[in-house]
C-alpha cells in the first residue's frame, strides 16, 4: 500500500514547474502518493489547515540553499502534528535543528537523504492498564490480637501531716560602731615654698662660682695679647698689598675718621672722570653716524629706519622704534652705553 504524502511549495518555485514535477516523480518512485499540495505561505497565514496524523511523508520544496532557508518556526510543530507516528519530513536543514528537537523530531543525517523523523515514544501516549490483585490460594487462619488485663487500682501512699511547730527566730547581730579615722593633712605654708626657692638659688650660684675665680693674680693684660705686627697696625689702618706692584697700600676702616676714606673716594672720582673723557663723543662725531641727514655717511644696509628687524648687530639704533627718513633722532639717551 502506497504511503500518503504532502507537498509544500515555496512561492518562488512556481516559476519553475519542472521542479514540482520532478519532486512528484521522486515521490512515486519512493512509493509515496502525493495526496495534497499547498503553498507554504497559505499554511502560514492559516487559510489552509493541515489535518492531524494523516501523512506518512511531507516534502518541502524551495529554491533556497540549505544554509539560507527561511522557514516559519511556528509551522514545525504543525507539521509534526500532521505526520503519523514515525512520519518523515524532507526539505529543512540543520539551521532549524534546535526547533526540530523541541518539537519532538529525531534528526537523521548518517545515511541517505537528510530528513527528520517524528518520535514514536512521544506521539503514543500510554493508556492506563488495570492489574487484578490475586488472592492467595491458602487462606491463613486469622490471628487474634493479644489481650491485656487492666492493672488493678493500687492505693496511693498516704502521708501524715507534721505537727505545727513554730519556726526558730534569729536575732540580728548588733554591729559595733567603728571609730572614725580622720585623715591627717599637712598644710604647707607659703613661707616654706619661698625658703626652698632661696635654697635652690644659693646652690645654683655655688655651683657656678667654681668656674669663675675672682683672683686678681690670674688676670691678663690686653697688651700682652698683641704681637709686633698687630702693634704696628694698632692705628686702625689696614695695609693691602697690590697684586701688580707688590706695594702696600693703606685702606680705610669701616668707621674711618682720619681722612683716608675721603682720599679713596676722591681717587675713585678721578678715575671715573678720566674714563668719561676717553669715550665721550662730540656733536660732530655723533652727527656723522646720523643716517637720516642727507650727505652724511649711512650704514651698509641702509634700512635702519625700518626697525630692529632690518638693523645690523652693531647699529646704534637698536632698541629704538622705526622712524621716517630725514627725521632727526636724538642719541643722547645712549651716550652712556657708547
Curated annotation (Swiss-Prot):
Residues 301-315 are annotated as: Fe-S binding site B. The keyword Iron applies. [2Fe-2S] cluster binds at residues 242, 253, 256, 258. Residues 242-258 are annotated as: Fe-S binding site A. Residues 166-232 are annotated as: Linker. GO terms for molecular function: 2 iron, 2 sulfur cluster binding; 4 iron, 4 sulfur cluster binding; electron transfer activity; metal ion binding. It is found in: Cytoplasm; Mitochondrion intermembrane space. Its cofactor is [2Fe-2S] cluster; [4Fe-4S] cluster. A motif (Cx2C motif 2) lies at residues 312-315. [4Fe-4S] cluster binds at residues 301, 304, 312, 315. Residues 181-223 are annotated as: Disordered. Keywords: 2Fe-2S, 4Fe-4S, Cytoplasm, Iron, Iron-sulfur, Metal-binding, Mitochondrion. Residues 190-203, 213-223 have a biased composition (Acidic residues). It holds the Pfam family DRE2_N. One of its GO terms (biological process) is cellular response to oxidative stress. A motif (Cx2C motif 1) lies at residues 301-304. Residues 1-165 are annotated as: N-terminal SAM-like domain. Belongs to the anamorsin family. Monomer. Interacts with TAH18. Interacts with MIA40. The C-terminal domain binds 2 Fe-S clusters but is otherwise mostly in an intrinsically disordered conformation. The N-terminal domain has structural similarity with S-adenosyl-L-methionine-dependent methyltransferases, but does not bind S-adenosyl-L-methionine. It is required for correct assembly of the 2 Fe-S clusters. This is Fe-S cluster assembly protein DRE2. It comes from Candida glabrata (strain ATCC 2001 / BCRC 20586 / JCM 3761 / NBRC 0622 / NRRL Y-65 / CBS 138).
Amino acid at each position: 500500500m502506497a504511503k500518503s504524502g504532502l507537498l509544500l511549495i515555496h512561492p518562488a518555485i512556481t516559476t519553475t514547474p519542472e521542479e514540482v514535477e520532478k519532486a512528484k516523480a521522486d515521490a512515486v518512485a519512493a512509493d509515496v502518493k502525493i495526496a495534497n499540495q499547498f503553498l507554504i505561505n497559505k499554511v502560514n497565514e492559516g487559510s489552509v489547515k493541515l489535518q492531524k496524523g494523516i501523512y506518512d511523508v511531507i516534502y518541502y520544496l524551495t529554491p533556497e540553499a540549505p544554509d539560507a532557508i527561511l522557514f516559519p518556526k511556528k509551522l514545525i510543530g504543525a507539521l509534526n502534528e500532521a505526520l503519523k507516528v514515525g512520519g518523515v519530513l524532507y526539505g529543512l536543514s540543520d539551521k532549524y535543528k534546535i526547533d526540530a528537537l523541541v518539537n519532538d523530531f529525531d534528526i537523521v543525517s548518517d545515511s541517505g537523504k537528510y530528513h527528520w523523523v517524528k518520535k514514536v515514544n512521544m506521539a503514543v501516549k500510554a493508556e492506563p492498564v488495570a492489574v487484578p490483585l490475586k488472592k492467595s490460594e491458602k487462606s491463613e487462619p486469622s490471628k487474634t490480637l493479644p489481650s491485656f488485663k487492666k492493672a488493678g487500682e493500687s492505693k496511693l501512699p498516704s502521708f501524715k501531716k507534721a505537727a505545727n511547730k513554730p519556726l526558730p527566730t534569729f536575732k540580728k547581730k548588733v554591729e559595733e560602731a567603728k571609730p572614725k579615722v580622720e585623715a591627717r593633712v599637712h598644710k604647707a605654708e607659703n613661707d616654706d615654698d619661698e625658703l626652698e626657692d632661696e635654697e635652690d638659688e644659693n646652690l645654683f650660684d655655688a655651683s657656678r662660682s667654681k668656674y669663675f675665680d675672682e683672683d686678681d693674680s690670674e688676670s691678663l693684660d690686653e697688651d700682652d695679647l698683641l704681637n709686633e705686627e698687630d702693634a704696628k697696625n694698632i692705628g686702625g689702618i689696614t695695609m693691602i698689598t697690590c697684586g701688580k706692584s707688590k706695594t702696600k697700600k693703606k685702606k680705610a676702616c669701616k668707621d674711618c675718621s682720619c681722612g683716608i676714606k675721603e682720599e679713596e673716594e676722591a681717587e675713585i672720582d678721578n678715575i671715573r672722570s678720566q674714563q668719561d673723557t676717553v669715550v665721550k663723543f662730540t656733536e660732530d662725531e655723533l652727527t656723522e653716524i646720523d643716517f637720516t641727514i642727507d650727505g652724511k655717511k649711512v650704514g651698509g644696509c641702509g634700512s635702519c629706519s625700518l626697525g630692529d628687524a632690518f638693523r645690523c648687530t652693531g647699529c646704534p639704533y637698536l632698541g629704538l622704534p622705526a622712524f621716517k627718513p630725514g627725521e632727526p633722532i636724538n642719541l643722547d639717551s645712549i651716550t652712556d652705553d657708547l
